UniProtKB/Swiss-Prot annotation:
Binds 2 divalent metal cations. Magnesium or manganese. Keywords: DNA replication, DNA-directed DNA polymerase, Exonuclease, Hydrolase, Magnesium, Manganese, Metal-binding, Nuclease, Nucleotidyltransferase, Transferase. The lineage of its organism: Bacteria, Pseudomonadati, Pseudomonadota, Gammaproteobacteria, Enterobacterales. This is DNA polymerase III subunit epsilon. Its EC number is 2.7.7.7. The gene is dnaQ. It catalyses: DNA(n) + a 2'-deoxyribonucleoside 5'-triphosphate = DNA(n+1) + diphosphate.
C-alpha cells in the first residue's frame, strides 16, 4: 500500500446508529470534519460541512453532538458535497478513530448516490488509529476522550462532540502516537522503570522520524511536561538526563 505524506484526519457525526444488525442502515451523516497535515504540520486546508439528512436525529445522538433538526434544514445534502469531499481526500492517508464506524457510514452514503458502488478506500488509504491505540495501551480505554486525557490534550472548549473539533483532537493524538510509539508507555505512571529504560535503549537504536522534528512548539511543551511527570513519579527519567540536561 502506497503511503502518502498528506494525512487527512477525519470525523463524522450522524443521526444515530442501530444497536443491532447493520449499524448505519437508514441513518445518515449530518456533519463531516477533516483537517490536513503534511509532515505532521497542520496546513489549514480543512474540510467541514453540515449535511441535511432528510430524517430526524435520534435523541441519544443529539445528546452527544447537540445538532438539531432545525439547524440542518437549509444545509446541503450529501450528494451535493460528495464530489468536493472525495476530491479533498483523494491521494491521502485518511486517519480515522474506529474507522469501521465512519467508513461504514460514508460507503453507505456513496452507495446511495453512485451506481458504480465505489468505496472510500478507492480514493485513499484508510488508517484506523484504534488498533494502534490498543497496541500502545492494552487493556485500557482507548476512546478519543481517553486518549486526549492520557496525552493531556486540552478539551475544555468541547461541550459537545463536533466532527471538526474531534478531527483536530485526533490529529494531535495521532501525532503523539506515531512520534513516540516505542516510548509512549512511559506516560503510564504504573510503568516499571526497568521497562522504561529498556524501551529507551531500543529507541536509541532507531533514528527519529522526520515528523518528530516538525512537532509544534505546543506539542514539544506537552512532551516535556510528560517527561517531568515521569521523573516526579519514578524518581528518574532517562530522556531528561540524556537529552535535556
Amino acid at each position: 500500500m502506497k503511503k502518502y505524506d498528506r494525512k487527512i484526519v477525519l470525523d463524522i457525526e450522524t443521526t444515530g446508529m442501530n444497536p443491532a444488525g447493520c449499524f448505519y442502515k437508514n441513518h445518515k451523516i449530518i456533519e463531516i470534519g477533516a483537517v490536513e497535515m503534511i509532515n505532521n504540520v497542520f496546513t489549514g486546508n480543512n474540510f467541514h460541512s453540515y449535511i441535511q439528512p432528510n430524517r430526524l436525529i435520534d435523541k441519544q445522538s443529539f445528546k452527544i453532538h447537540g445538532i438539531t433538526d432545525n439547524f440542518l434544514l437549509d444545509k446541503p445534502k450529501f450528494h451535493e458535497i460528495s464530489v468536493k469531499f472525495l476530491e479533498y481526500i483523494t491521494n491521502s492517508d485518511l486517519i480515522i478513530h474506529n474507522a469501521k464506524f465512519d467508513v461504514g457510514f460514508i460507503n453507505y452514503e456513496l452507495n446511495m448516490i453512485n451506481s458504480d458502488k465505489r468505496k472510500i478506500s478507492d480514493y485513499c488509504n484508510v488508517v484506523d488509529t484504534l488498533p494502534l491505540a490498543r497496541q500502545l495501551f492494552p487493556g485500557k480505554k482507548n476512546s478519543l476522550d481517553a486518549l486526549c486525557n492520557r496525552y493531556k490534550i486540552n478539551v475544555s472548549h468541547r461541550d459537545f462532540h463536533s466532527a471538526l473539533i474531534d478531527a483536530k483532537l485526533l490529529a494531535k493524538v495521532y501525532t503523539f502516537m506515531t512520534s513516540f510509539q516505542q516510548s509512549i508507555s512511559i506516560f503510564d505512571k504504573n510503568s516499571n522503570l526497568n521497562s522504561i529504560q529498556k524501551n529507551a535503549k531500543l529507541d536509541s537504536r532507531v533514528p527519529f522520524r522526520s515528523t518528530l522534528l516538525l512537532a509544534t512548539k505546543d506539542e514539544l511543551q506537552q512532551h516535556m511536561k510528560y517527561l517531568k511527570y515521569v521523573k516526579q513519579e519514578t524518581g528518574n527519567c532517562v530522556w531528561l538526563e540524556d537529552k535535556y540536561n
